[in-house]
């Protein structure tokens, strides 16, 4: 899908660049595969703000996406491609030969009328799902499981993908978009292809209101606040904050490493922080 640019007839349209979604289905989603979403506004169950700068936004309904792909050896046909307000990728409505409907993440080069299938030994073509142990080395994949049967967790947002670069003692070696190389069990399922909507990274909202439509409120800098609100606040005139960057709660930020899950370090063969050679 292409990008749409606009003539600058208003200030908000001067910089506006959006994805052309004219080829997507224009109707409503399949009702049995949707559920109502209530607005949280960044609040928890006690009503206190736990995530700042969230609130408002257009009403949404949640689409149930099949991330597990465990309907094995049943062929499904792509009925239509749809927009999903809850994610950056597009989704595809699949009708299986037994009549069941399901939504899956739409990969690039998947078109209406194409057939997809999940199984232990299926063709390597976009939209098909299979265990990593059944894939040829070098395959571009998305929606990759970290634990067999848990459902895809890696490479699910627009334009992303991972690559199967090798195998080792029942484990698959993946190269992720970040540059990280990681071991995953060969029994984990993954889907073939890269995720749809690769132009998502090139859009320009053109005005603050488009972020508000998505439920994102203005992100206020700490140095623009008062001392009561932030460690960087206060000072006469504009200041640089006067200390190394910290969160509103005084903890170091901007580059401070926060990873604490040492149990899975053994699965990371090459860190995403290593210098690119």
Swiss-Prot record:
The keyword rRNA-binding applies. One of its GO terms (cellular component) is large ribosomal subunit. Residues 222-277 are annotated as: Disordered. The keyword Transcription does not apply. One of its GO terms (molecular function) is structural constituent of ribosome. One of its GO terms (biological process) is cytoplasmic translation. PROSITE patterns: RIBOSOMAL_L2 (PS00467). Keywords: Ribonucleoprotein, Ribosomal protein, RNA-binding, rRNA-binding. Pfam families: Ribosomal_L2 (PF00181), Ribosomal_L2_C (PF03947). InterPro entries: NA-bd_OB-fold, Rib_uL2_dom2, Ribosomal_uL2, Ribosomal_uL2_bac/org-type, Ribosomal_uL2_C, Ribosomal_uL2_CS, Ribosomal_uL2_dom3, Ribosomal_uL2_RNA-bd_dom. Disulfide bonds: none annotated. One of the primary rRNA binding proteins. Required for association of the 30S and 50S subunits to form the 70S ribosome, for tRNA binding and peptide bond formation. It has been suggested to have peptidyltransferase activity; this is somewhat controversial. Makes several contacts with the 16S rRNA in the 70S ribosome. This is Large ribosomal subunit protein uL2. The lineage of its organism: Bacteria, Pseudomonadati, Pseudomonadota, Alphaproteobacteria, Hyphomicrobiales.
